[in-house]
Structure formats: C-alpha cells, structure tokens
C-alpha cells in the first residue's frame, strides 16, 4: 500500500508480544505500555499474543491485562483468542489468517508489525526473518543486528573489531563448564555469569570466588547452553537511547543512570530481575548527572555501536563509566517499554513524549520497508 493510501486512513499496526522466551512476561508488560500510549487517532491497533508454547492468538488489546499485579506476571494463555498465522508470502500483503491449517479465513490485514518481543524466538532475528519473508514492514532492527544484539559474545566481538571499548570476558560452550587458569587470571574476581543469549538479568549470577562458578554456570545453562563470563567493571551504570528517524538519520537521547549499590541491604547487589521488575528497589536517574563533555562522548559512542552492528530503528546501549572512560556493556535492539523502562524515560527527558516516540518508530519502519538496504 502506498504512503498516499495510508494518509487517507489510520495505519494498521499489529503489536506482537509474549513469545517462547523466558522474557515472555516482560514482553507482555512492555506491550501493555505501548498499547496504552499509541495514538488511536493515527493508528488502528491489533494485539497479537504469542503463547509460551508458540501459538499466535488475536487478543482484545486490553493493556490492563498486561501488567504486573501483586508480583504476578502476565502471560498469553492458550485459548485466550482466535489462533492465527502470518503466511510467509509477500503476495498476501500482511494478512493474518485463522487456524487450523486449511481454514485460511483472513482475520486482519496489517500495514506494519511492532514486534515487542524480548529474548530468543523474537528479539534474535527469528520473527524479523519471518516478516521479511512475508513482506511486512516492522519496527526495529533487521535479522542480522537482531541476532548479533541478542548474543553477548558476538556483540562484543563486533564492537571490539570496530575499535569500541568492551570489557573482558570468556565464553563457555558445552560440555565445558570451567575456565582455564589463564582466563581466571585475566578476568579476576568478581565476575558475572550470564546466559549468552538472554536478557532481563534472568539466570545471571555474581561470582566472588571460583568455587561458586560451577553452580553459576549451571544456573545460566537452564536458559542457554552457551554461557558468558564477564569481568566485573567498577563504574557508574549509564544508558543511552538511539533512535532512527524516517529519513535515516540517527539521534541519541539524554543519558540515564541506574544506581543499585546496597539494594535490599547487600553491597553485592546488582540490577537483577527482581530489582528491575518486582521490588522497585533500584534508583533510576534521568537525566544522569554527568559532565556535558562526557555525556556527549557517550552519546557518540552509542551511535557508533548502533552502526557497528548494522542496527536499524532503535536500540538502548548500556555503558559503564569507569575512571578510564566509558565501556560498552551491551546493546538491546528491542529494549523494555514498561512504565519503569529507561528507553522511553530517556527520550521523554530529551523532549520526545511516549506517543511521539512510538509514532516515529512506526513511521521509520514504513519508510524503510522490507528487503535489502
């Protein structure tokens, strides 16, 4: 459909959320916040939930059902709506069809998909590949950048190859579960042990003695067979949002800071899942109190990191600010959009309100279209 045709009516947006990853619930909460803030005068919104088992269902787009209430996490349940599929056929023009196979009734047709999916089977290039095959424009990074951004090892490799500062790390692939002596000496203690392709701090452990490493690796492997062991970096935790405009230019937001020292009374606390989403315990400063020159240097590093992995649309780049300068921790190609998430808060502090931010992402997706760029 042409841009002129879309001007005559509201743009039809499919917000896709949930999914098969262990970040299912946070995806639901992000989607609830997005559904609440999309401008209904400009966008006709369809909510598509993916169950933990992988079924796609057409839901009623009620954002109130997609919140954390009394520490209870939301979930897309089987039978909560009509099951559907997106045929990988560009001739179908973004049609969502009913299941079971053979029914084929066209339920909806969409102009653009907003894949609010966190973790594997969504944020990692898989749904982006499906949308490319189906010929449907979508918000956010393409297949390559999504896959790279999901994998902490390859993110660090690409950033380092581009001359960007990253911390020391080692990778454990099955069946290996221990570090070599030289790796232990290079990393030092403490270290953080993480699923290499995970997010929301799920499965992450802080290890302060090497005898704790096997248990930490086993915990991480409940979520991903590949484990990354990162040297602890002493410094302030800063974040920066990058946003692509419809004309392809990139802008970086004001910085945000996460302060977690002593959270829940422990000096070894870190920004784990409970601190992020359940306990409301971390302190978030937006804008961060950082010298103007340092802040601008970090903003430029964020844009360079975005370009280094060939990202598109949006990303949140996480840093440590050390005595020796900033170090890039990771890139989130589909950051959280919950009510407490840093990405929309940083843009709000930069003068871009939530509805405008979402509209810009959708406009950029439509301007980009699909295919090779």
From Swiss-Prot:
Enzyme class, spelled out: ligase
Entry's Gene Ontology cellular component terms: cytosol
Binding site for ATP: 184-239
Keywords in alphabetical order: ATP-binding, Cell shape, Cell wall biogenesis/degradation, Cytoplasm, Ligase, Magnesium, Manganese, Metal-binding, Nucleotide-binding, Peptidoglycan synthesis
Protein's pathway: Cell wall biogenesis; peptidoglycan biosynthesis
Primary localization class, coarse: cytoplasm
Record's cofactor remark: Binds 2 magnesium or manganese ions per subunit.
Keyword match Methyltransferase: no
EC nos: 6.3.2.4
Binding site for Mg(2+) 1: 318, 330
GO MF: ATP binding; D-alanine-D-alanine ligase activity; metal ion binding
Domain ATP-grasp: 156-363
UniProt GO BP: cell wall organization; peptidoglycan biosynthetic process; regulation of cell shape
Cofactors that this protein relies on: Mg(2+); Mn(2+)
Record's subcellular location: Cytoplasm
InterPro entries found in the cross-reference section: ATP-grasp, ATP_grasp_subdomain_1, D-Ala_lig_Van_CS, D_ala_D_ala, Dala_Dala_lig_C, Dala_Dala_lig_N, PreATP-grasp_dom_sf
Annotated transmembrane regions: none
Binding annotation for Mg(2+) 2: 330, 332
Domain of life of the native organism: Bacteria
Catalytic activity: 2 D-alanine + ATP = D-alanyl-D-alanine + ADP + phosphate + H(+)
Function: Cell wall formation.
Family: Belongs to the D-alanine--D-alanine ligase family.
Name of the protein in question: D-alanine--D-alanine ligase
Source lineage: Bacteria, Bacillati, Actinomycetota, Actinomycetes, Mycobacteriales
